[in-house]
């Protein structure tokens, strides 16, 4: 077996930690022969490695079972024993509750999936960030440092860092390896609503109740640009798929599309009749399917935007033309968040009406409704492949299985 230098060092550290428990002389000899340095030794490394092996083993078993089931279904389909219909599709899209995560002492405002590992982060009005193993449902760690509500969090693309936005006016960058805050970004003059890393992790985008949007350089912690046009609290700001533009939404009921290089507003999108809570760009493969359905194949952009509002509506926008493609109605209270199914066609939304709704964006229809998904208002949701996470004022996070 060939190990990288880093893997070899970590293995030697783990062996040394094990020997220290009962075999001190052997540990000292091994430390000398393996050249384990005191500064290298990371606390609980052996336990972390062992837990990783256990989790990976469980994951392998689960995947093997899924492969076996899929092979059986494939064999039956090839033999003509399975007939697929629309009801099968609707059944496939039904979220099935897997875990209920409890531990926060106040409402949970945000959830975020690690880009590589089976870690879910949650942010709460109790001022803490919690990390969970979403495969087992086990609590892992609490990050403390903010002095007020934590409103949003996001992982960087490498998974090494997590950033958090708080009502204490700050943004914090945390190193996951040591669970420590390595940088605090100061510049907003009111609560920070949302944060997002750029695709390469070089920049962080933030939105604030001070009516401003800021672009931060991660390496230096300096604010590179401020975008100011909104008249009220900016609820959310996100990068476009090509990262040439920014979309923002506000308590002023407006959505702005900004050109990052110039800092100018390209479009002002109006149509919502109440506070716009969130905007999200539709993934490229989904946007292409919608444009094809809309017979707009000649449009070169794939920057389609979804907005959700307290007016109970969800709107889909073409951000190049600055036009509303269509509106989805059905929720009975404020709509707070959306996430996109991996197939690119379906979208899930959450609301103060305590429901989860599944939408087909090509058909512009609601396909499924899950009643009383939480005991109180559902604030946000995220999808990682076929795991769907929701968070609520009821202080809990729920994990749902999708297929």
Curated annotation (Swiss-Prot):
A Pfam family reported for this protein in Swiss-Prot or TrEMBL: WD40
Location(s), subcellular: Cytoplasm, Cytoskeleton; Cytoplasm, Cytoskeleton, Microtubule organizing center, Centrosome
Cell cycle found in the keyword field: yes
GO molecular function term, any single one: dynein complex binding
Coiled-coil ranges from the UniProt annotation: 51-87
LisH domain location: 7-38
Keyword Metal-binding listed: no
SMART domains in the cross-refs: WD40 (SM00320)
Mapped WD repeat ranges: 103-142, 145-184, 187-226, 229-270, 271-327, 330-369, 373-403
Biological processes per GO annotation: cell division; establishment of mitotic spindle orientation; microtubule sliding
Signal peptide extent: none
Location (main, coarse): cytoplasm
InterPro entries with a match to the protein in the record: Dynein_regulator_LIS1, G-protein_beta_WD-40_rep, LIS1_N, LisH, WD40/YVTN_repeat-like_dom_sf, WD40_repeat_CS, WD40_repeat_dom_sf, WD40_rpt
Key words, A-Z: Cell cycle, Cell division, Coiled coil, Cytoplasm, Cytoskeleton, Microtubule, Mitosis, Repeat, Transport, WD repeat
PROSITE patterns named in the record: LISH, WD_REPEATS_1, WD_REPEATS_2, WD_REPEATS_REGION
CDD domains attached to this UniProt entry: WD40
PANTHER family: TRANSCRIPTION INITIATION FACTOR TFIID, TRANSCRIPTION INITIATION FACTOR TFIID SUBUNIT 5
Function: Positively regulates the activity of the minus-end directed microtubule motor protein dynein. May enhance dynein-mediated microtubule sliding by targeting dynein to the microtubule plus end. Required for several dynein- and microtubule-dependent processes.
UniProt comment concerning the protein's domains: Dimerization mediated by the LisH domain may be required to activate dynein.
Family in the record: Belongs to the WD repeat LIS1/nudF family.
The protein, known as: Lissencephaly-1 homolog 1
Originating species: Paramecium tetraurelia
């Amino acid at each position: 077996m060939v190990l990288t230098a880093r893997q070899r060092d970590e293995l030697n550290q783990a062996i040394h930690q094990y020997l220290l428990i009962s075999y001190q002389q052997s540990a000292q000899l091994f430390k000398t022969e393996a050249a384990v340095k005191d500064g290298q030794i990371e606390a609980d490394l052996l336990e972390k490695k062992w837990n990783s092996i256990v989790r990976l083993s469980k994951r392998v078993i689960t995947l093997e079972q899924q492969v076996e089931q899929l092979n059986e279904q494939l064999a039956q389909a090839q033999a003509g024993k399975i007939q697929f219909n629309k009801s099968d599709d609707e059944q496939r899209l039904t979220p099935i509750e897997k875990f209920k995560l409890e531990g926060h002492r106040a409402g949970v405002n945000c959830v975020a999936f690690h880009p590589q590992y089976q870690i879910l982060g949650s942010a709460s009005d109790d001022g803490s960030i919690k990390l969970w193993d979403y495969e087992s449902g086990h609590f892992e760690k609490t990050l403390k440092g903010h002095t007020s509500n934590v409103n949003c969090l996001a992982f960087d693309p490498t998974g090494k860092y997590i950033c958090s936005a708080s009502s204490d006016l700050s943004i914090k960058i945390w190193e996951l390896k040591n669970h420590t805050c390595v940088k605090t970004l100061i510049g907003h003059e009111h609560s920070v609503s949302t944060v997002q890393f750029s695709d390469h992790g070089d920049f962080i985008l933030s939105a604030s109740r001070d009516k401003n949007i800021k672009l931060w350089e991660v390496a230096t912690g300096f604010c590179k640009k401020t975008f100011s046009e909104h008249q009220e609290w900016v609820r959310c700001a996100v990068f476009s798929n090509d990262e040439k533009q920014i979309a923002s939404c506000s308590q002023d009921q407006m959505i702005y599309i900004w050109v990052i290089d110039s800092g100018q507003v390209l479009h002002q999108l109006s149509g919502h009749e109440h506070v716009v809570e969130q905007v999200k760009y539709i993934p490229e493969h989904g946007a292409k399917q919608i444009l094809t359905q809309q017979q707009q194949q000649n449009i070169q952009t794939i920057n389609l935007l979804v907005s959700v509002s307290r007016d109970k509506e969800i709107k889909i926008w073409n951000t190049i033309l600055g036009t509303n493609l269509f509106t989805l109605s059905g929720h009975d209270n404020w709509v707070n968040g959306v996430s996109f199914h991996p197939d690119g066609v379906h979208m899930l939304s959450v609301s103060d009406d305590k429901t989860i709704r599944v939408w087909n964006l090509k058909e512009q229809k609601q396909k499924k409704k899950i009643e009383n998904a939480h005991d109180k208002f559902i604030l946000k949701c995220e999808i990682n492949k076929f795991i769907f996470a929701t968070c609520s004022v009821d202080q809990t996070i729920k994990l749902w299985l999708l297929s």
